[in-house]
């Protein structure tokens, strides 16, 4: 693909998300989502591989369905209330339809069926964009309308996502599918807490993007797409392999890594809201995700080949262009937990 075309598509991605961020009208917000979808579709299919074509087709059909449902719900809301404002969602029929449409856009369970299959057919860089940037626009709409949405529906969606995200990753051998189910589980935490604390939901989104970016970039450095290939990477890129292992543990929420911070604060907030049963279920579902991350790290650590450093040096790769951003993201992923009191003070 031409660099000029790639630049135009990436600019369109930024434009679509910005339009959704700044719009107060449902029609403009829908337009921003459509620009996002149309911009990422050529980026997904640029390899001309059958799996990439299949993944792009699945993604496009799913996003088109979600967009159609969202447009119908907003038109119905405008017809019944006479309001196009995104903050006005008083129609009883439109609110659940918009919830389902945004859940389908993001990949929240039980509308998650497309996400693992689509990510599996994409290269890691495009998968990174799909797992992080493409979540921003629909999450913004969910953020703006959360006060109008049904609390029970949001709770069921969030709890289902955390459980399915944990169970779905248990029997996977492909790293991209593992990261897809990790994304589903993290979205469940955001959907749960957005009803009670919007600032916590934003913090969770920010840390999720940071940790997921670190995981994807380290896997790109390692050129790894399967779990069993991680065990052979110690000889070529030992530092990146160690970073990948710690980033995966951070995604699982293991202290003292950064991933523990949002789970800690969310469970604390749910307890303050007098929801101890929900907090307990969320904590137990987080153990499912942590288990398959620990299994991956077990595979990586117990199969280190007994080579001396002299044998390993000649095979090590030189640092690439991703070294500096990866280093900065890694520091945030691994060492931000001590800043939790500062984060809480800023949010309050």
Swiss-Prot record:
Keyword line: Electron transport, Membrane, Mitochondrion, Mitochondrion inner membrane, NAD, Respiratory chain, Translocase, Transmembrane, Transmembrane helix, Transport, Ubiquinone
Subcellular location, record wording: Mitochondrion inner membrane
Catalytic activity: a ubiquinone + NADH + 5 H(+)(in) = a ubiquinol + NAD(+) + 4 H(+)(out)
GO terms under biological process: mitochondrial electron transport, NADH to ubiquinone
Lineage: Eukaryota, Metazoa, Chordata, Craniata, Vertebrata
Annotated gene: MT-ND2
Catalytic activity, EC: 7.1.1.2
Topology class, membrane: Multi-pass membrane protein
Protein name: NADH-ubiquinone oxidoreductase chain 2
GO molecular function, one term: NADH dehydrogenase (ubiquinone) activity
Protein family membership: Belongs to the complex I subunit 2 family.
Function: Core subunit of the mitochondrial membrane respiratory chain NADH dehydrogenase (Complex I) that is believed to belong to the minimal assembly required for catalysis. Complex I functions in the transfer of electrons from NADH to the respiratory chain. The immediate electron acceptor for the enzyme is believed to be ubiquinone.
One Pfam family per UniProt: NADH_dehy_S2_C
Transmembrane segments: 1-21, 25-45, 60-80, 93-115, 149-169, 177-197, 200-220, 239-259, 274-294, 326-346
GO cellular component, as recorded: mitochondrial inner membrane
Protein's organism: Latimeria chalumnae
InterPro entries in the cross-refs: Complex_I_Subunit_2, NADH_DH_su2_C, NADH_UbQ_OxRdtase_chain2, ND/Mrp_TM
Residue pairs linked by disulfide bridges in the UniProt entry: none
